[in-house]
UniProtKB/Swiss-Prot annotation:
Keywords: Disulfide bond, Glycoprotein, Hemostasis impairing toxin, Hydrolase, Protease, Secreted, Serine protease, Signal, Toxin, Zymogen. InterPro entries: Peptidase_S1_PA, Peptidase_S1_PA_chymotrypsin, Peptidase_S1A, Trypsin_dom, TRYPSIN_HIS. The active site is at residues 64, 109, 203. One of its GO terms (biological process) is proteolysis. Residues 1-18 form the signal peptide. It comes from Vipera nikolskii (Nikolsky's adder). Snake venom serine protease that may act in the hemostasis system of the prey. Monomer. This is Snake venom serine protease nikobin. GO terms for cellular component: extracellular region; secretory granule. The gene is sp-VN. Residues 25-248 form the Peptidase S1 domain. Belongs to the peptidase S1 family. Snake venom subfamily. Expressed by the venom gland. Disulfide bonds join 31-162, 49-65, 97-255, 141-209, 173-188, 199-224.
Length: 257
């Protein structure tokens, strides 16, 4: 069964939390503390997600991560240990499709957040550049986040975990997910044989290819990391003009075209 992974976040009060574990994002390892200066921990009254710092004032995450009392934490690794350069912000503006009827699991699941004050770059805080070209099938890319390290049982870690996955041909994903349109603005990525995957709590997390932000986790199979069930990531390259126009102040279009 396919579903939006954010649904599991609604049960956070019932979940078991874990300290550092040897079992990791599904099939991954604890991220090196210095490899994710752009990674943001995004929370609200409804769920926990991840996001990506793209310049000192703007963060990208998934539209379905929206909620009240949103908080964006940067410079975070172990959530139980405060880094000296950790910085916390709240949204000043949010640009996304306001109604869930305007975005789907394969289109417009993206939110651009303007922070209330810019962050200062530091050892553990620095932006990543947007994808400069479409995803290349077969490319090995990096996923990361504080999502569950086990599925279907949900165990949320204190530290982010990372894994390498591959860009998979879109038509292969259509074969598994027939509801996908002929051309969706998503990147299909994972391990076709299963074993490595992002999962519940990773929504909005970055897909990093060649050092650039190629995608944001949108949805996938449940349980996670199953064979023939790669994840679907919002394709950043397809939204780069909208993102750049908002940042430059050339448009106020809340919902991307």
């Amino acid at each position: 069964m396919v579903l939006i992974r954010v649904l599991a976040n609604l049960l956070l009060l019932q979940l078991s939390y874990a300290q550092k574990s040897s079992e990791l994002v599904i099939g991954g390892d604890e991220c090196n503390i210095n490899e994710h200066p752009f990674l943001a921990f995004v929370t609200s009254d409804r769920r926990r997600c991840a996001g990506t710092l793209i310049n000192q004032e703007w963060v990208l995450t998934a539209a379905h991560c929206n909620g009240k009392y949103m908080k964006i934490e940067l410079g975070v690794h172990d959530k139980m240990v405060r880094n000296e350069d950790k910085q916390t912000r709240v949204p000043k503006q949010k640009f996304f499709c306001l109604s869930s009827k305007e975005y789907t699991m394969w289109d417009k699941d993206i939110m651009l957040i303007r922070l209330n004050t810019p962050v200062n770059n530091s050892t553990h805080i620095a932006p990543v550049s947007l994808a400069s070209r479409p995803p290349v099938v077969g490319s090995v890319c990096r996923i990361m986040g504080w999502g569950t390290i086990s599925s279907p049982k949900v165990i949320l870690p204190d530290v982010p975990h990372c894994a390498n996955i591959e860009i998979i041909k879109y038509s292969k994903c259509q074969g598994v997910h027939p509801e996908l349109p002929a051309k969706g603005r998503v990147v299909c990525a994972g391990i076709w044989q299963g074993g490595k995957d992002s999962c519940h709590g990773d929504s909005g997390a970055p897909l990093i290819c060649n050092g650039q932000l190629q995608g944001l986790l949108s949805w996938g199979g449940d349980p996670c990391a199953q064979p023939l069930q790669p994840g679907l990531y919002t394709d950043i390259f397809d939204y780069s003009d909208w993102i750049q126009s908002i940042i430059a102040g050339n448009t106020t279009a809340t919902c991307p075209p």
